[in-house]
Amino acid sequence: MTDDEILAEFRAADALLQGHFLLSSGRHSEYYLQCARVLMDSERAGRLAMALAATLPRDLRQSIDLVVSPAMGGVIIGHEMGRALGKPAIFVERPTGTFELRRGFTIAEGAKILMVEDVVTTGLSSREAMETVRAAGGEIVAEASLVDRSGGTVDLGVPFYP
């Protein structure tokens, strides 16, 4: 899927908004891609996940043991990436301000993890979620994101596939 085709998916879902937006990172933007809205259609979410999965090198796709995403925004795209890759998908959540594994989710020692987000701006939530995964024994091999709001400047310490 080309960038234009991805934007067409956002437009079709009325999820490409124009105006003035204050982002959760504190930054301002003239445009806002509402990922929750574009992902509410399961067929569209599946197409976008397949396109995102296709950006990963084949050897990376084959090495992944588990997809992990931070709640809330990453849950749907993380699940769909798991489906696209044929891998299990779980999420970490922040009930008290720091990410943790809950709901009986576990990570096997040394498991190769693909972190998946809906949107990355500063990368802070990704890095915090990665700390939780590493503390549980996982090895983050890459991150994929539906939207890169950093303009290509974010450094997550692992290969990044927006």
Can you describe what each PLM-predicted range is?
Residues M1-V116, V120-P162:
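PRPP-associated nucleotide enzymes
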